[in-house]
């Protein structure tokens, strides 16, 4: 995420004094709620969906994830790369390529 966007999210939260409500537990709940709203976009069809609604719900998920990263003082690149390293070890290409059972 671009620094300008991160700063905008932080300012939005700060201007409203909402950080006091952003406990890790509350943020995790909010991420889950918004992820389910994203899932709702695909409730009745795997192929037909309203992209503007998908974008809105996906943005909500990302904003709450960004807030959690800040709250826990985590670096998104660092934690994603750590997880990708574990996934690469767990699902080597030669064993997992094209194997539906090993889809992460």
Model-inferred region functions:
Residues 1-104:
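Flexible "arm" and connector segments at domain edges
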């Amino acid at each position: 995420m671009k620094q300008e966007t991160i700063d905008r999210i932080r300012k939005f939260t700060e201007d409203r004094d909402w950080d006091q409500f952003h406990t890790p537990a509350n943020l995790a709940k909010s991420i889950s709620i918004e992820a389910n709203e994203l899932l709702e976009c695909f409730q009745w069809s795997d192929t037909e969906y309203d992209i503007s609604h998908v974008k809105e719900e996906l943005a909500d998920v990302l904003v709450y994830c960004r807030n959690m990263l800040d709250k826990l003082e985590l670096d998104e690149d660092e934690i994603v790369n750590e997880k990708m390293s574990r996934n690469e070890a767990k699902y080597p290409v030669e064993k997992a390529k094209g194997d539906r059972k090993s889809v992460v």
